[in-house]
Each structure stands twice: as C-alpha cells, then as structure tokens.
Amino acid sequence: MNDPNGLVFHDGLYHLYFQYNPQGSEHAHLSWGHATSTDLARWTEHEPAILWDDTEQIYSGSVVVDHGNTSGFGTAEKPPLVALYTAAADGHQAQALAYSTDGGYVWTKYRGNPVLDRGTSDFRDPKVFRYDDGGDGYWVMVAVEAEDRQVLFHRSDDLKTWTYLSSYGPAGPVGGVWECPDMFRLAIDGDEDDARWVLLISLNPGGIAGGSGTHYVVGEFDGTTFRPTAPLPTPAPELLVDRGQSRDELEAFGWIDFGPDCYAGVTFDGLAAHERTPVSYTHLRAHETKA
C-alpha cells in the first residue's frame, strides 16, 4: 500500500483510492484499493476498485465527478465518476481512463485506452481538474515526466482526447524524481477575487530533511501556462544526475512539511475551494513497517 489516489468527495462521502497489491506486500500487481469515510477519521474499506491485469499495472492518478457528462459515460442527471490513472507495463507509462456509474465502487476500463501516450517510461501521476475560462470551461491534466523533473499540462473537453498545453521545470528542488503533482486555486484570506494557484510536487529523495518531501510553488495559471510568482532558479544539468542540493539551497524553496516523511500528497476533488483538503502518506515509515 502506498500513494493516495483519486481523492474525491461525492454524495456526502470521502472516497480514498490508494496504491495496493491485492496479492502480497511486494511492489507488484499494483491496483487501486478503495475506502470511504464521512469524517476523514474513520474509514470503511471496500473491494479493490481498479485491478491490474496482464497488460498493465495501475499506478497513481485522480478521480473527478463529470457533472456535465462531458465524457458521455453517464447522464446529466447521474454524472459518472471518471478516473485518469497511469497504465504501466514493460518500461512504458501512459495515461488511461476508467469510469464508474454507481458512485465509485465498480469501475470499467475505457476501451480506447490509453488516452494520452508520449511513448516514454516515466510519464505518470495525472491529476485532473476543471478549469473555468469564463465560458464552458475544460479539463486540465497535470502530470510529470519524473526523471526529467518536468510537470506537463494538457487539456481536454471530454476527458478522452488530450492536447498538450505547456510544461514547467526543471526548477527549484531537483534532488529526486518529481511525482504526484497537484494544482489548485487558493483564495487569499478567503477573497475569491484575490487568489493564487498552488502547484504541489513530491520528491523522492530530495526533501528538505533528507528523505522524501512535498514542494509547493505559488503562481499564476492562465489556462495554458503556470508561472511562479517568484521564479525559481533553473538547476545546473549535473544536479539532475548527482542529485546534490544543500540544506541552505533547499530552505529557499516552499515545503509542505519539514520532516523526512511527507509524500505523494494530493487534494480532494468535489470540495469547495476553501475546503481544500490533502492526504499524504509516510513514505519512510511505510518501508520500515512489516506487513
């Protein structure tokens, strides 16, 4: 068990999906486990949601409520839940889709998978949100090329066909691979007319305390490009290889937590903007705890 995936609040329930091996404790047969809660403290575990098969393992991703039924998998009266996840197999990673019409318990993999394939080995962890452009809006996917320390932005009208928008990075902390990005708009002191965009990036290793860590960047997003309010330095190419940044260098960047064990944190879809709620996992402790 590791990364929290597909966090979504729907019909009064918090749904937490998570990386899970239903056949053992080793890093294999990766699927999505599933639990629900009404209060974020007490959880009920359900049957695994999206299972691995002979063609793919189910890596991290996200879930959205498709209120406008833009995907066509549900109806306007009963919108589907749509999951975008990384399908991983044989050194290749691409983004795939599954959908649920029963509130998030039974999932069907889309026959047209993958929905976004760059032909690379480290393209993963899609986080999807709805962007309001003043018109009908559209979907934005934030994902990473992990080893390149780049965040890639794509857009879609129907969650099935994706178009490249822009990239961010490498910049700031690069002492480990970039994974599990998230991005959301956050009002300053509750004023929706004065808001910033926050980009979250998990690093492993390369955190400020020497282990894993979650870095944040505050900036602007115009629907195409993310621009930090205070631009971060572009690292020298050798840093992407030797992964050496000092504590003093790392203190210049934003961190969610200053311990060595905060990783893969993402926020719930379906909550009001002022209720932005993340869930992370304790990466080091997970590896030190016996199954």
Question: How would you describe each model-predicted region?
Answer:
Residues 13-16, 73-83, 136-140, 193-198, ...:
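Entry beta-strands of beta-propeller and related beta-repeat scaffolds
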Residues 79-109:
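Carboxylate/His-rich catalytic cores and anion/metal-binding grooves
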Residues 1-18:
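Beta-strand-rich domains and repeat architectures in extracellular enzymes and scaffolds
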Residues 1-6, 24-27, 41-76, 104-132, ...:
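Surface loop/turn signatures of beta-propeller and other carbohydrate-active proteins
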Residues 131-181, 185-206, 223:
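Active-site neighborhood of glycoside hydrolase catalytic domains
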Residues 282-289:
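Conserved small/polar residues in nucleotide/adenosyl-binding loops
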Residues 31, 92-96, 149-152, 209-216:
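Structural motif
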Residues 34-37, 97-101, 154-156, 214-223:
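Beta-propeller blade signature
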